[in-house]
């Protein structure tokens, strides 16, 4: 019996150490971050939490022995998968140029007319990207844009007073540099049982709780100010050149209850290796199928609605998460730094994560 108890104690100790190896020290987890409600007129949302506490959590991961940098963006090109909701992205190289009277030569590119680079490829949504109408629009009458309301109660007149105006409020330039701790949830392993999640399949709040426990993050959980990345495996469908046109036609995503769960935990941003964050069943974009079960009526992109207009949480779409998941880097320091385009509703972004692969030994606490 004594030997048996010792064996149980050893297993418990090893399990505890495994959990500790995946997370920041408790003293860093307990550092206080600012909490809502935010001041009237706020345009930062949950990014108000970025500060000393999140920087210290981030710095711990950077200093971990064996820490490496992971690219979380897809390579952009003229033949990459393209969103059906944005103008085509075509980069046109210009001939090499020179400056008369000098020995200089230089190269540059232009974008095609109508291009929307901020909504193509790996990109981030500003809080002013999404609004909510008083009731569903029938698509036949003119869009009642004047009825739109945004995060913080801003009206259409506040945010976009004329059809051709940039965002006057909630534009991307209001977002601070996101430098904070991140959690990666491996939904391909937990929900998909090792297979790519199916189109329209959802990651629920219960799944998130289960993944945290399975990945040794049960005690840490999701901290205020975290960025959460969810690896669905759908990024495997990202092919360049995009000949089969599957990637943007459908996708797995977060369930509405998962969006509410993450919002309650005050994350700063959510990122998926999928194009919509929301689940999109096959046929939904063509109008031949409805949204995923559990989606509120009239809000087929309910996660966009909740995160952007209600909670002030940014979206990173088309993130590249396969290497982070392969190395089981469940927690890391992430940096998300889009261009500060004034009045922009979205931007190209090159997020990175810095963390130590799980297979490497971690330093003692």
Tell where the protein language model's regions lie, with residue ranges:
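Active-/binding-site microenvironments in catalytic and ligand-binding cores
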Residues: 23-365
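Bacterial N-terminal signal peptides that target proteins for export
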Residues: 1-8
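Hydrophobic h-region of N-terminal signal peptides that target proteins for export
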Residues: 11-21
């Amino acid at each position: 019996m004594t030997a048996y108890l010792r064996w149980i104690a050893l297993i418990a100790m090893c399990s505890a150490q495994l959990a500790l190896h995946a997370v920041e020290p408790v003293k860093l987890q307990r550092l206080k971050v600012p909490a809502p409600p935010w001041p009237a007129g706020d345009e930062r949302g949950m990014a108000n939490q970025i500060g000393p506490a999140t920087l210290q959590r981030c710095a711990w991961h950077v200093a971990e022995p064996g820490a490496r940098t992971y690219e979380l963006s897809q390579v952009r090109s003229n033949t990459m998968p393209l969103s059906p909701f944005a103008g085509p992205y075509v980069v046109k190289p210009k001939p090499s140029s020179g400056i008369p009277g000098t020995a200089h030569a230089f190269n540059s590119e232009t974008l095609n007319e109508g291009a929307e680079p901020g909504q193509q490829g790996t990109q981030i949504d500003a809080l002013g990207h999404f609004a909510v109408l008083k009731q569903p629009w029938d698509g036949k009458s003119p869009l009642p844009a004047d009825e739109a309301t945004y995060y913080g109660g801003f009206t259409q007149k506040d945010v976009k007073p004329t059809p051709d105006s940039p965002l006057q409020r909630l534009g991307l330039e209001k977002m601070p540099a996101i430098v904070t701790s991140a959690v990666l949830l491996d939904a391909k392993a937990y929900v998909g049982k090792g297979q790519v999640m199916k189109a329209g399949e959802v990651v629920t709040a219960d799944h998130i709780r289960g993944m945290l426990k399975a990945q040794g993050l049960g005690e840490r959980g999701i901290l205020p100010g975290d960025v959460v990345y969810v690896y669905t495996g759908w990024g495997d469908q990202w092919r360049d050149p995009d000949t089969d046109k599957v990637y943007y036609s459908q996708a797995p995503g977060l369930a509405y209850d998962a969006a509410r769960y993450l919002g309650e935990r005050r994350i700063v941003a959510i990122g998926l290796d999928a194009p919509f964050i929301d689940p999109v069943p096959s046929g939904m974009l063509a109008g031949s199928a409805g949204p995923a079960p559990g989606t509120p009526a009239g809000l087929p992109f309910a996660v966009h609605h909740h995160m952007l207009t209600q909670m002030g949480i940014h979206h990173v779409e088309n993130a590249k998460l396969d290497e982070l998941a392969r190395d089981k880097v469940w927690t890391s320091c992430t940096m998300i730094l889009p261009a500060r385009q004034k009045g922009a509703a979205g931007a190209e972004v090159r997020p990175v994560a810095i963390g130590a692969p799980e297979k490497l030994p971690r330093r003692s606490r």
